[in-house]
Structures are given as structure tokens and as C-alpha cells.
């Protein structure tokens, strides 16, 4: 099981040959840092009476990088548009393409976990890669693409097409609208690459342990009068055996990004195709009812349960346009579609005892997800006396339908986590597994916001609200018939934030925002006084207070205090309602930038006190929340060595505190520390810039358990080597 067929071996040899050619002649295993490429914003005429706090950024362009190119100087804040980090009353980090490339990230999860408040909540070689932000789960399916939901790859988001990965922490319903899955920990927004004024032709060959070979080509050009037209094309192929025993992967990605930037009209079109197959896919462990303690983490090189596959394909297209109606009024609109086709055989192992015995039941799953996402709005800048205004109106619509086929008539299996067994995947030949309707969701919203500036915009007050309608219907996937009542509820979420600039380089802020999740439906039981009743959307609430310090754009340091509460349903006095609540209260400190000549730091620390604040189950109130560590710490460092020009060495330490794996707090998972290391070397060969990169993840090959907020366990990533050569023609 898991061995490549002759056909796949032939394809891998072709990829390997191409990579070896790209790597030929590269004796060095190091690479130099690459300067981030920025794009000149299109000119926008601004009324003399309007005070502008930061330079305008054209459609699809990311704010200029700061902190030695590690992060962006701003981010897309939903209805508020691209906003400087110093003008934003929220905690936000925008990781640049330079950081993504130098870390040799393979997915958005690799990038996001550089943040001390973010951790993966699933294994990298799992079917999906989900995140935990401020202690709440955020699945890949809830990521935004250029500010719009429902358009990113459904299970795992690659990074080769991205200019930025933006993380806005906390619920953001008023800013972006409700996420498709109702996650509230934060918004991960993916900003696509655009053609720059300087031509780009870059080819990268890579090899990752055990023997995954890859090729990535990135080509961009601008043309026409004033370089108004742009095209950026990215293509990537990876194929081979991973560090996991008997596991193989094959990934293919293609994208075309077209854009036009005129004096008044700006538009863009992104076309993306992604395909990924994993053989011997890893799944997370569920906890058995008789488990009394968590066994020691097993080898990180074994697949669990040791069978199955995942084969998925995503196709998406996104068109956006904006037009300056006047010097102070801009209209914009966007439309996108995404289609997921997925076929998998997987089995979730159930951990039975401290000795490491587990059982599993296999299932063959097929799924399609069709998403249509629309946005439209207006932005206006003007003054009323001494007060400046940035007014924004937004309309969003997400229509998403999914079909599912699920067959589970396979014999169960048993094994032990220390045995490292590989099983044959049962044959699906002759089995009928038709697709039937599974879910339909329609999210419609209208929002209005105004940022008022006082004292020459030293004091900025943002007020806004969004009216969100949530419609949904679940279906019995066995026959496609509706299951339960149709959901149709609305809610209004406010937005309030204030920023005071003590100095141009020092901002103090406070904010209040809410998030939305679809309410639950009461069970149809005679013992319930309100059987079948659907609850209004759950409102998560966050209060935040923070300070930001920007030292000449060389270093950014932030400190934030926050309290985030999320309600849940339960039964109290025979009535089903909103009776539960989890409260995450904490503090974050993060920093990024050049602290000394040639020395750059990226990291921080977070403390979260996550408790069950309200509960209907006796004994749970006051317990620690599942899967949320008290302390998390990240520290990444780069040093441009003076003794070898062009050579940079780097390292990272990631620490995650102990967590509880069940609601009763009787099962706990030990803390873990991971150390990464690497180097890069930049030179020229025959006048052509060449960059070599070498990274090691989990340098000391520690075995550890990771936990998810749903109470699952997964085994951490084994020691992984990645080497690449990038040639810029």
C-alpha cells in the first residue's frame, strides 16, 4: 500500500530530472535574502480638503512592505479597504511573498503558524489543514481570497500564487461578513500576485525529504501605455515520497492573473487551478470513551491509520473592478466562482487506551462544492468642517451548495500507535456511491462604516454595522431529501474602533467587534419544550485594547489585550437555547523587523486563559477549554553574515504549552517545543541572480502530539529537509 505505480514512478522521474537540472551546479546549500518586490500604486486624485492618513493603494495591490520586508505595512480590512497597520484598531499581520519564499512554505498553514497566536489544528499530511487563531478553529474553507469568501481552495491553500497572507485576529463579521463555516477566531485573507513594473521571470527547482521534487515558474510582465496592463503567470508541480512512511504526494497548480490600472478604472481577473493527491493520507485521532490518559506520542514518521487516499481538484475565477466616479467617490464590484471535486478513502482512528491501541472504520467519500461570491460597494472621502470622513458601503452575497457521497460498509481494523502498520486500502470496485445534495447556504449582507478623523487624523474613530441574513438547508445525503427545517435568520453586528496617534510612530487603539455563526436547531424530542426551534445566529463578541510602535518602518512591535466570547447551545430546564459560552481572555506581544544591521526578528508570545464560562452540563463550568494552550511562543531570527557576503543563516523556536483534550479536563497533552534551522545564499552566476535555500523543520526530530479545539489529536511533523535553487532571468 502507498507504493507508486509504474506510471506515477515515470512521472516522478520526469519531475526529478527537471529539478535536478535546475539544481545542477549548485554546491552551496545556502541562500541570500531576496528584496520584496513592490508595485507602484495607480495615481488617484484626492480633493485638497480631504486629509489622507496613508498613501492610496490601487485595486489588487498590497501595501508596501516594512520591517525589513518581513511583513506588510497594512492589510485589506474588509469594508474599510486597504488600511495602514498604524491606522487599524485591530491586531493584524501581513506576511510578504519574501517571507513566504525564504521560509520555503508549502501552504498557508506554514505561513500563518509564524504568528504566536496561531497554530495548526490538523496534521500537515492530513486531508485538510486548519488553523486555531486566538483559541478558536478557522478552517481553510473559511479563508478569504482578496477579501471575498468561498473562493479559496477548500482543503489546503498553496502559496505560490500569493503576494501576501494577511491575518486579522478576532471575529470580523462587520468588516468582511459572516464566514461560510461561521468561524470567529480571525480572518485569513489571501492576496494574489500582480505583475510589477519590473519584469519577473523566475524558475525554482526544489527537493524535499524523503524524495519530493518540485518545479515552480513565476512570470510577470506589464505592457501598454503607462504599463497599464499586467499579466502574472504561476505554475507549480511537486511529486514524490514524503517523510511519512509509505506516503506519496502529487501537487499541481496553475494561475493566471490579469490586471488593468488606468487613471480612473482598475480591474483584475484571477484564474486558478489546483490538484492534489495524497496516498496513505494521515488522519487525526479521536478519543475513546475508556481512555484514562494520553499515551506518549508515537513516531512522527508513521501514517495513522496507514491506508487510504485523498484526491482533490479546485478551479476558481475571480473578477474585480473599481471606478473613480469623482475625485472623492469610488464604486467597486467583484464576482467569483469556485468548484471543488474531491474523492477520498479515509479512516479516523479511535485511541482506546494508554497502551496506544486504536480501532478504525474506513469510509469512501466523494464531495463537490460549488460557490458563487459577489461583492459591490462605494467608498468616499470628504470633510465636514475640521472632521475628515472615510465612508464605505458594502454588499456581499455568497451562495454555496455541496453534494456528498459517503459509503462506510467496510470491515473495521485495529492496530497500535507504536506498531507502525501499513494496511491495504479496501477495494471500491463495483460499489455504488452516488452524489446527493448535502448542504446549501446563502449569506447576504449590507454594511455601512465611517472612519472619522480629528486633530489632523491623529484621532480616528471608526463606527459601522452589518446586517447579515443567513439561509441554510441540510439534506440527507443518502437520498438528497431535506433534513430538518430550513434556516432563515438575520442579525446585525456592530463595529467600533478608535485609534490615537501619540506620535506618528506610536498608536494606541481600542475596538469592539462581533462574529456570527449559524444557530442550532432544537432536537425533536418530547422532553424538549421547544422541539425543532431554530436559534438566531450566535454572536461572538470581542473587546480589544492595544499599542503599536513602528520604528522608521524598520521594526513593528504590537501589544494587544483581548477578550473573546463565543456562545453555544444546550438544554436547560427542558428548553433548548443559547446557554453555553467559551471565554478566551488573553494578551499578545509580537514584533517584526531589523533590530540591528543584518539581524531580523519575527515572533512573539501569547497568553490565553480559555475557560468554559457558561455550561449546562454539571461540572464543566469553569473548566479549561479543549485544545487551547495557556502559552504560545515563536521566535524566528535571520543573520546576514559579514564573513560571507550574500549568506544568511536563520533559525526558529516554537513553543506550545500543555492543553486539555477533553471537556472534563481529565486528559491532557504535554507541551512541545520545535526548533527549525536553515540558511540561504544569494549570488550571480554568469550575471544571472541565483538564490539557494536550505531549511530544516523539526531539527531535533521531536515526537509530539498536537491538539485541535474539537478534541482530536494528531502527530507533529517529522524532521523535514527542503533545498531549492531559484534563478531570476
Regions found by a protein language model. Name each.
Residues 28, 47-198, 545:
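Acidic, small-polar-rich N-terminal luminal/periplasmic segments of exported/outer-membrane proteins
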Residues 160-163, 174-255, 260-266, 315, ...:
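Outer-membrane beta-barrel translocator/receptor signature
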Residues 259, 369, 388-400, 437-566, ...:
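Structural signature of Gram-negative outer-membrane beta-barrels, strongest in the C-terminal barrel
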Residues 391, 510, 543, 626-729:
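Conserved C-terminal beta-signal and adjacent last beta-strands/turns
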Residues 560-565, 578-663:
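Gram-negative outer-membrane beta-barrel transporters
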